[in-house]
Each structure stands twice: as C-alpha cells, then as structure tokens.
Amino acid sequence: MASQTVTERLRELAETVGVSTGFWDWYGNWKHVEDASLVAVLNSLGFSLSSEPSHGEIDEAFRHNEDLVWLAPLPPTTVCRQGNEAEIPVHVPHGMGVWCHVETEDGQHHELQQLDRWIPPRMVDGNLIGRATFKIPNWLPLGWHRIVARHEDGSECSSTLVVVPQRLSSRLDDGHKRWGVAAQLYSTRSSGSWGMGDTQDLADLAAIVARNGANFLQINPLHAPQPGFPQENSPYLPVSRRWASPLYIRPEAIDEYVHMDSKERGVVTRYAHASRSHEDIVDRDLSWKSKIKALRKIFELPRSISRQAQFERFCAQGGESLENFALWSALVFENGDIDLPERYASIDAPGVEQARQRLASEIEFWQWCQWIVFDQLIRAQEGARRLGMDMGIMSDLAVGVHSKGSEIWSMPDAFAPGMSVGAPPDMYSQQGQNWAQPPWSPRSLAQMGYAPLRDMLRSVLSYAGAVRIDHILGLFRLWWIPEGMGAQAGAYVSYDHEAMVGIVLLEAQRAGAVVIGEDLGTVEPWVRGYLNDRGILGTSVLWFEKDGGGWPLWPDHYRRSCLAAVTTHDLPPTLGYLEGAHTELRNELGLLVEDLDQVRDADRIERERMVSRLREGGFIHEDDPSEEELVLAMHAYLAASPALLLAVSLVDVVGEKLPQNLPGTNAEYPNWCVPLHAFNGKEVLIDDMAHCDRVKRFLTSVDRYIR
C-alpha cells in the first residue's frame, strides 16, 4: 500500500476532528476544500500547524489530538438521553484506584458502577495513563448534574453531566393544529411608540390577534444591539444573544414613571415626540437618542423596597454575564464607538478592572435597562397567555453575534479565533456569503459545559412560549471562513448535534416551550428526520414547496411536523409577490442580473400555477378574485395541510406590499426599517388594527380554516 501524501494525511486529520474536506456545490459537483483553508480551520480548533505542514507535523497533530483525551481525567461534558445507558471514561495514573458518583442538581448522590473492561494504558508525556470505564444509569432525572471522580490518593475532579429528553414534550402533543401571526415588532408601531414598535405594542398586538383566535405571535429576534450609535438595523446581527434590546422598552410603562411630577413627565413626553419625527422610516438612532435620555431620568427615581429587591434579584441571577455585558455597554457608550481602545479591548485587558470601579453607576444603569426590558417582555407574555394564547410570544434566535460585540469581548475562549460564519457558493451568491459573525468553538463549548447555549436559551425562553431557531443547521455544522480568505474558501465544521439539540430540548421542556427550526434551503434529509424524531418542528414556505414538475406542492404532501407560512421576512408580502413587485424593485435598484423579461415570465408562470392549484383544489371559485380573496385562499390552502402550525404574516393581514428585507442589499434598500403599511400605501398603526374590518375579517377567516 502506497504511503499517503501530505494532503491526504491532512484531510484525514481534518475529517477525524469534524472538519469536512469538501462539499457539494449547487451543480451537484463535489468541491474539495483547499489545504490552506484546512490548516487555518484546524489551527483555530487548537492545532499548531505551519502553512505547509510536513508529515511529521501532521503525525504529531494526530498524537496530540489523541493525547488530549487521555490527559483529561473526565470528558469536559457528557450529554445523554434519559432512558439510555451511557459510558464515561475516567483517566488516572495507571494502577491508581478511582470511584465515581453523580451529584444531581437537586443534591442527590448516586454511585456509578465500574465496568469490567480492560483498555491498555497509554504513555502520555512520559506518564503511563490508565482508563477506567463507568456506566451512567438510564434512570437519572433530567437536568444539569455533576460527575465526580474520587482517586485513592484523596484527590477529586468533576465535570458536567446533562440528562436530556429523548423527545421534546410540548402542548403540540395533543395533535391539534394551531395558528398565529408573524410580525416584525420594530415595524409595528402605535400612536404611543417611540419611533418603533416596543413591548407595549407587543402586548397590544398580542391582545388583538388573541381575540381573533391566534395561538401565538411570532416576532423577530429581540437580542441586544450595541448601546451607542449608529444602531444596527438588522435584528440578526446582535452584540449578545443572551441579553435583550433596550430599544424595545416603553418608558411610560416602567412602574417608577408614575412617581414623576408633571414637569418631569413633560420632559419625557417631549423626548417621545422627538423620536417620532420620521413617519416613513424606522429610525433606530433617532428613537434611541430620545429614549435613552428618558430612561436615564427614570433610572434616577427612587424604587420601592419590593422593586429594588426584584432588581437586585435579577442582577444576582444574571451574575457575571450581566455585569460584564453592562460593563462592556458602559465602555462602548463612553468610547462612542464599538471599536474599543487597546486598554479595554477584551475582558482581561489592563484597564478593564479599573473601569469597572470607575463606571459603577453606569454599569448599574445598563443592568437596570436589562431588568426593565425583560420585565416588560415577561409581562407581555403573561398578558398573551391570560388572553387564551397557549403559546403566546414566539421569539426568534439569531445564528450568531457581532464580531466586536459583548459576547466575544467577555468570553473570547468560547469562539473560534480568526474565523467567520457564512455559506458556500450557491446559485444566488456565486462567491459565497460571509456573515461576519464568529462561530462558537465546538471544543470550547464542551469545556464550558455548554453554559453559553444554556444561558442564551433560558433568557429567550423567559418571555416566550415558543422559539424559532434561525438556520438550525448551525447546531449540526457551520461554514467557517478563515480570516483574509474569500467566502468560497471555507469549510464545514461539525458540532456535537446530539449534545446541542439535547440541551435545546431540555431547556425548552423545562420552560414548557415549542421549538421550531428554520430548515429551509439545502439540508441533508437525515437532519430533518432527526429533528422530527426529537420533537423539533421544521419550516415550510408555500412558494418554496414544489413538486418534481415545479408546481406548488399539494397541501396533503406537506410535513405534519412543521410551521407552514405563505411568506417570510426575506420574501415580499404576498400581495407584492403576486404583483411581481420584488422583481420590479430589484430592477429599479440595478440588482437584477438576469434578463428582466425572462424573470417577469418566470414570475407570471409561478403565479398562474399557484392560481391554478387554488382553483383545482376548490380554494377559489370566482373568475376574478380580489387580492384579499386570493391571499386568503393561499392561507386556506396551507390550513388544509397536515402542518401543526400556520403562521400568517401581519403584512398579509393588512395588505402590505413592500418587503421588510431585500437580501443582497445594503444601502440600496432600507432593510429592517420599513414601517407597516396597508394596501393603500398608508402606515397602519396598532390603534387602527384594533378596529379594522379587514384585520378582523382576515384573522377570523384563518381561524375558521384551522378549526
């Protein structure tokens, strides 16, 4: 057998540690990942390879990778399903006795049985290391536990044990179909909004849709943006996914506001008016500039004993994570830019601890902002549930965070250095995509006991009865792009999906929440099957569900375990789509690379096929249905499918035509800044929706379809 080349050996190393050495392109061709990309990705995972590694270097990397397992007394984290037995290796100096037990989160103590299994010892760094294998029983309770190894010399070590559900148990287990409304909260304003939709608008919108039979209100991610200016418009590029955006606070709904005298209230009212000067756009900078002034005034007001106790409890629960987020916020706001100077560049930078003392009051302000926004979100959810929504708010979880955000500042070890997340080339983006978001390091996550994932989920689920995970494939693998290379020069890196999905299930089940995974696009078939088996719903969009001939898929061929929708935030509202407004808009902006007439023809054929399906299925009967009748018929079509959840976009309810987001654009279009408009081009306020015949007619029709 011929010896392997350096490239072959490098690829073997990559595959061993979960780095794919190739991928299928959109033409169905297998594309190899270049050696330089593999070296960069491997080094980000903790190896130390030169740019052109030798056989000896790669052999040493293999040994190092194997030695790491033996040098760890216990695996950093063990995740197992309840009801399944598992085994855990324990490493000790060869010949030393060792005993293991589990300490459950509620304080119980369970000794583990050592298996009668001989595994030859291994020489590591001149020391002979032995391995003992212990059995984890199948009857341990769900939860976050500790495995403790006790050595005969009296020393101890421990690691994380997470027992997770086999399958998520949720309210959907009753088999009943449910529906709800999907809205971009920032765009859904009222006469009381500060230039953008907020928590009070969320509560009021939930009340409107609940009265008409909706079971949930799906919204955009509410993750934290940077505290200063300019504000990031995209809700999918936060600085932290654990903490929330104070832009969504309604100042007048803060309990302490009622204690303001008339003069102080007048000042707050003027701030509110100043935030509303842009009626045709959602101006986050303008809104935040006014709102933060009001928040600082309210922050200075005295709090009752019980309110102060609630604030202190929130800070204690948030712990170091909240304090560090608040410290980072204070530093960035003081600096006036998200690019901090060297003395504050990371949590362990030389000036940080001194700043922590100097900015104590400012840190408390940013902690208080988090307390207020979470308090208002939780109240909105409680109100929705009281009105009969069995899920209430369905929040959204973004793929990642800003490369200069608070998460990478405060826990840099959790992220893969020198890497960015994106997507390989496809027919829509032939150079690939770079999302400028650092990926979590799979090895670091395990070392940290998956605490970042757990804490993020707990925060989001504290105010939501359901969560949609954007790009859920990211729990299985992500496209890593080395710094300085093009998006096409990346590689897929695998994550321990069994552990990560299991933790999602555990936290969701404890919160009584439903989980939906956004699994649109290219997803390996086994992934959808795996998620379905674990109780996570997929996502189906009417325009994307086609049969082999390119016709709309018949309703009875849809998945049962999914959230079905006619459109999404990355597509135009249905009226705009039916009119081809998205094509005309892209043409006007000079973004259309295909022939305009050909694209118009393709749009026309797609519309005609949809109308034909609707007629053939008996969903429309009129020769010339109105726009509203046509859009309703499309929702009736989806309601006839087995899909457990149906999401109705608020833009379709009111007859909006403008898209919220035009993928592939930046300055060309005001993405994520378009206020909600009706079919007549006028802005629709929540105040109007409460008494709007069209809104009531649309929602009650959908409720009738589902029931």
Report residues per predicted region.
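Short helix/loop capping segments that flank catalytic or ligand/cofactor-binding pockets
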Residues: W24, R171, S191, H402-S403, ...
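Structured C-terminal cap/extension of enzyme domains
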Residues: G655-R707
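Acidic/aromatic-lined carbohydrate-recognition and catalytic surfaces
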Residues: N43-G83, E87-Q114, W118-R150, V163-M411
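Short acidic/polar inter-strand loop motif in beta-rich domains
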Residues: E152-S158
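Domain-scale activation on soluble regions of proteins
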Residues: R211, R343, H621-E622, F698-R707
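Basic helix-extension-helix modules of the SAP/HeH family
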Residues: M1-S48
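Alpha-amylase-like alpha-glycosidases and glucanotransferases acting on alpha-linked glucans and related
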Residues: G228-F374, G400-A647, V651-D652, A667-E668, ...
